[in-house]
Design a protein with these regions (language model features):
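An aromatic- and glycine-enriched ligand-binding surface/loop that stacks and positions planar moieties
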Residues: 91-260
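C-terminal substrate/ligand-recognition segments
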Residues: 211-337
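Long, intrinsically disordered, low-complexity segments
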Residues: 57, 93, 123-196, 284, ...
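Conserved, well-structured interaction surfaces
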Residues: 1-29, 45-52, 62-75, 287, ...
Length: 427
């Protein structure tokens, strides 16, 4: 190393990688083995460490990283600001909300939201700022100030891979279950030759989905209220979200019939199993990833993907203020994100943990590690003893976190931890 700064930058980047994984492990499994040094010989006697002690060590490590890792790094590497986001999450896990707020303010000041249209997509019809922000081009555009940490994958990069979101997140519209009202097969992957590249080309326009990642009703309906009528991220915006009812009957055999070129009508006799995978709506603006190398059976090509961006930091700031009972400040932070999207502003009286989680769902769909964040919030409720408004003022406790039978068994009863109650209510 040429100097202390270079050495500490490398050490800080390594600390990030370790803390990133332990942050997830401690919220997925609780107490886990902790490695403080490289394992150079076979070892079979690992023992778990207390999760709180691990998080305290991660906080120290990430304070070091936040000090020494540079602000400007190659795309895909952790920067000072990525270290700040992770440090903020660890601080929140430990109930250190004042420090988390201090860091969060620094991060968003250095990484402002993208509020104007950008990239070459900005002139495309039927698109908006959300399409720009989540396009392949935006994640490769160095003028994008909002992106903080990315998975890097694009053509000619070693280790690249296709994302397959158009396959997994799009309904299974081509499996033969979607029929015309008179019972004929309605949709085809390969349209008639004159329909290719037109609005009738469902494969080109949304991808050949198989519906393995269907949104729950919570994501499709519950979180989109009257206050989100003009939200660019939501189901009311039919450029941003698509449903099977936005596609077209395009089977070549239908040419000359009254249904050819019409929007699908949900078959009355469609089974529940078919409707689960074949008939739903999804956030097209996030999942549409064109692949120039294919001309049919489009699944979603190579693209970078956000791990951290400053919109999440605003929502983390809002959550910190919620824990501190500073509801107006929480609303202010959430409204920065909501106003950018076109949603109505929230008042202090609207704020509770449900409001925070709903906004995370709207903004961070397919980005946040939802299970991990719900687990973190569950631990914070038990750590702080704060009454949970969305569940009748219930107070959770650490000494009963996994249920009355002790910490070695799974929770099977409501009212034991927030995670169980939230998932039971929303899923």
């Amino acid at each position: 190393f040429k100097d202390e700064a270079e050495e500490n930058a490398v050490r800080g980047a390594a600390y990030f990688q370790r803390a990133y994984r332990y942050y997830k492990l401690t919220h997925l499994f609780g107490d886990v083995p902790y490695l403080s040094q490289e394992i150079e010989t076979p070892k079979v006697d690992f023992y778990t460490y207390d999760r709180w002690s691990i998080l305290e060590q991660m906080e120290k490590d990430m304070e070091f990283a936040y000090q020494w890792v540079p602000e400007k790094v190659d795309r895909g590497k952790p920067s000072k600001w990525a270290c700040g986001v992770l440090l903020m999450k660890v601080c929140m896990s430990l109930g250190h909300f004042d420090r988390a707020i201090e860091i969060g303010k620094e991060v968003v000041a250095a990484n402002p939201l993208m509020t104007e249209r950008f990239t070459t997509n900005k002139t495309k019809p039927n698109t908006n700022l959300m399409h720009d922000l989540h396009s392949v081009e935006a994640k490769m555009d160095m003028s994008n100030t909002e992106g903080i940490l990315y998975v890097v994958s694009y053509p000619e990069v070693e280790g690249r891979d296709r994302i397959n979101t158009m396959r997994n997140a799009t309904p299974y519209w081509a499996n033969g279950s979607i029929k015309t009202p008179d019972g004929k097969t309605g949709m085809s992957i390969v349209p008639a030759s004159e329909a290719k590249g037109t609005e009738l080309d469902n494969d080109a326009n949304v991808g050949r989905g198989i519906g393995t990642c269907r949104p729950t009703n919570y994501y499709q309906y519950d979180i989109w209220t009257e206050k989100e009528k003009n939200d660019l991220r939501g189901v009311y915006n039919r450029d941003s979200w698509k449903g099977v009812f936005d596609l077209y009957y395009n089977a070549p055999a239908l040419k000359g019939t009254e249904w050819y070129g019409k929007h699908p009508v949900k078959p009355v006799g469609m089974s529940v199993s078919d409707s689960i995978r074949c008939w739903f709506q999804w956030p097209h603006y996030k999942t549409f990833v064109p692949d120039p190398s294919v001309t049919t059976d489009r699944r979603g090509g190579e693209t970078p993907w956000y791990i951290y961006r400053s919109a999440e930091v605003y929502l983390m700031l809002a959550e910190c203020y919620y824990w501190k009972d500073m509801k107006q400040e929480a609303a202010n932070m959430m409204n920065v994100v909501r106003q950018r999207a076109g949603a109505e502003s929230l008042a202090a009286s609207d704020i509770n943990i449900g409001t925070v989680l709903d906004e995370r769902a709207r903004e961070l769909y397919y980005e946040e590690n939802r299970h991990v964040e719900l687990s973190r919030i569950s631990y914070v409720y038990a750590l702080t003893g704060k009454a949970c408004e969305v569940f009748g003022g219930h107070v959770y406790k650490l000494d009963n976190f996994s249920g009355p039978e002790g910490t070695s068994v799974n929770c099977k009863d409501a009212g034991v931890n927030f995670y169980f109650d939230w998932v039971s209510a929303k899923n």
